């Protein structure tokens, strides 16, 4: 069974590859369905597809109350499913456990009675965090520059000018502030890069899975093996390409999932037709999925 949804195309695909920083603690990668605790980057928390899509929608609309109906639309109906309300309640409960969040005193997902759910934690993208830290480092270097200018411009006023030879060590003392200022500028440039490398995981990288009709099919590194799904993936991409030829042919397909008999194919097109980007989800075991794609 396929699930196609216009909202998922407009909202989700516009953020392919974007990672979110939650409360300056977790890095959330919706493409690989993972959470990484920034204090312990060795531990990777793998989210279920439902929990990941819930968090994805909440992260794109922080502090906004998302109705239960909107969540049902985004997580299930757009994928071709109709589930009862208990499925959403269970998925929210599981997501809170992954985030180590409390229902009584939530730090991340807050229940708004009779309305829905709200992500109350601070949310930034990795790019926004880098820009903020770079700006902070630049601000730190400014006071030193101002002081140096003040010292160099404060010349004593006197009616009598006396030409007195300056000791050699004056040159050494004058060059010291310049050296210190250069070091501060160098630190300001390198600090954001060092912070990013040490505290944030790298942008999602991919490895090749197969090539179908000249279209590369990739999967995230460290992703569970998708070998059993290869026949289904190849058939689905081939069928998709038959209906999308010429300039509408995708330039890349990213395959994720594979667990719980669910496979997600993200069809990515060229920038000129990026509006065609779409996510297709197959819900079947690898053998039956071939029949679905036909």
From Swiss-Prot:
Main subcellular location: membrane
Listed GO biological process terms: regulation of DNA-templated transcription
Cytoplasmic side of membrane: 1-182
GO molecular function term, any single one: DNA binding
Recorded topology in the membrane: Single-pass membrane protein
Pfam families linked to this entry: Trans_reg_C
Signal peptide: none
Gene3D superfamilies: Winged helix-like DNA-binding domain superfamily/Winged helix DNA-binding domain (1.10.10.10)
Residues in compartment: Periplasmic: 199-294
Keywords: Activator, Cell membrane, DNA-binding, Membrane, Transcription, Transcription regulation, Transmembrane, Transmembrane helix, Two-component regulatory system
SMART domains linked: Trans_reg_C
SUPFAM superfamilies assigned: C-terminal effector domain of the bipartite response regulators
CDD domains associated with the record: trans_reg_C
InterPro entries found in the cross-reference section: OmpR/PhoB-type_DNA-bd, Sig_transdc_resp-reg_C-effctor, WH-like_DNA-bd_sf
Cell compartments where the protein resides: Cell membrane
Protein name, as recorded: Cholera toxin transcriptional activator
Native source organism of the sequence: Vibrio cholerae serotype O1 (strain ATCC 39315 / El Tor Inaba N16961)
Classification lineage: Bacteria, Pseudomonadati, Pseudomonadota, Gammaproteobacteria, Vibrionales
Gene this chain is encoded by: toxR
């Amino acid at each position: 069974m396929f699930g196609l949804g216009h909202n998922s195309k407009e909202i989700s695909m516009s953020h392919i590859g974007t990672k979110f920083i939650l409360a300056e603690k977790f890095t959330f990668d919706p493409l690989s369905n993972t959470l990484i605790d920034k204090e312990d980057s060795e531990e990777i928390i793998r989210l279920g597809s439902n929990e990941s899509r819930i968090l994805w929608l909440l992260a794109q609309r922080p502090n906004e109350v998302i109705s239960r109906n909107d969540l049902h639309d985004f997580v299930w109906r757009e994928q071709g499913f109709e589930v009862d309300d208990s499925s959403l309640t269970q998925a929210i409960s599981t997501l809170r456990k992954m985030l180590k969040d409390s229902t009584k005193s939530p730090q991340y997902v807050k229940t708004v009675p009779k309305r829905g759910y709200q992500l109350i934690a601070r949310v930034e993208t990795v790019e926004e965090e880098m820009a903020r830290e770079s700006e902070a480092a630049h601000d730190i270097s400014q006071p030193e520059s101002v002081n140096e200018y003040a010292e160099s411009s404060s010349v004593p006023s006197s009616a009598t000018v006396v030409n007195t030879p300056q000791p050699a060590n004056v040159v050494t003392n004058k060059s010291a502030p310049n050296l210190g200022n250069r070091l501060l500028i160098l630190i300001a440039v390198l600090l954001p890069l060092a912070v990013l490398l040490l505290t944030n995981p790298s942008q999602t990288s991919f490895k090749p899975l197969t090539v179908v009709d000249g279209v590369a099919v990739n999967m995230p590194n460290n992703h569970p093996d998708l070998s059993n799904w290869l026949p289904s993936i190849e058939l689905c991409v081939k069928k998709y390409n038959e209906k999308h030829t010429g300039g509408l042919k995708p330039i890349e397909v990213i395959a994720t999932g594979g667990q719980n008999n669910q496979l997600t194919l993200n069809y990515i097109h060229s920038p000129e037709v990026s509006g065609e980007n779409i996510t297709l989800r197959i819900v079947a075991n690898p053998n039956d999925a071939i029949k679905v794609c036909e």
